[in-house]
Design a protein with these regions (language model features):
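Active-site region of glycoside hydrolase catalytic domains
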Residues: 1-200
């Protein structure tokens, strides 16, 4: 989160980004950060779940991180540290290995999950909002996406949607608690089937 928000709010990347991802950082032109950190009217946050990881030399870079890194392949291929004989996927993995960013995902047992396997943990939304509130001088916040994929069923003409109902109820409760703690949340947009028409 700080990878994206710190440049917007403070005009610089977190130091940890340069420590771990220096070889895949985008080229930063002279006035880029000044443009990126121009004043914004509001901050939109998409939130669905949390990810749990632990350190370990035997761990692997998560698929999510690899997908993000692949977007920077053009810049990575220009690096002299990477062999032209390796496949792109191997290049990325080797690069991450060189930077000592080994970790592995932790799949907790006996936790509620959505139909696509994401953990349901609304408390993480409260932590995100309060942490950002205490770290940055933020504009008003809008939750621009929040929701869950649920394998619901129609029973006697009625959609059995208890899990999704509970998901929204609990996450809205976290937003309410964040507001009580001083976070300036102005709006909340539930993710719905209509959102799929953006890309599906």
């Amino acid at each position: 989160t700080h990878w994206f928000i710190k440049p917007i709010m403070e005009g610089k990347y977190p130091e940890s980004v340069f420590q771990h991802f220096i070889n895949i950082m985008p080229t930063i032109a002279e006035n880029d950060m000044a443009i990126i950190s121009e004043k914004i009217d509001f901050l939109g946050l998409n939130f669905y779940s949390r990810s749990m990881i632990e350190s370990g030399r035997q761990g692997k870079v998560s698929d999510t991180i690899l997908r993000k890194i692949k977007r920077a392949e053009v810049r990575i291929q220009e690096s002299n540290d990477i062999s032209a004989d390796d496949s792109k996927g191997d290049q990325l993995q080797k690069l991450m290995n060189q930077k000592n960013t080994h970790y592995k995902s932790v799949d907790l047992e006996e936790v509620e999950r959505t139909h696509i396997g994401w953990e349901v943990y609304p408390e993480a939304l409260l932590k995100l909002l309060t942490d950002l509130h205490h770290t940055y001088n933020l504009p008003p916040i809008y939750i621009t996406e929040n929701g869950a994929a649920v394998d619901d069923h129609v029973i006697d003409g009625v959609v059995d949607d208890e899990q999704r109902y509970r998901y929204y109820q609990n996450h809205l409760s976290m937003v309410d608690q964040a507001i009580e703690k001083g976070v300036d949340v102005r709006g909340y947009f539930a993710w719905s089937l209509m959102d799929n028409f953006e890309w599906a």
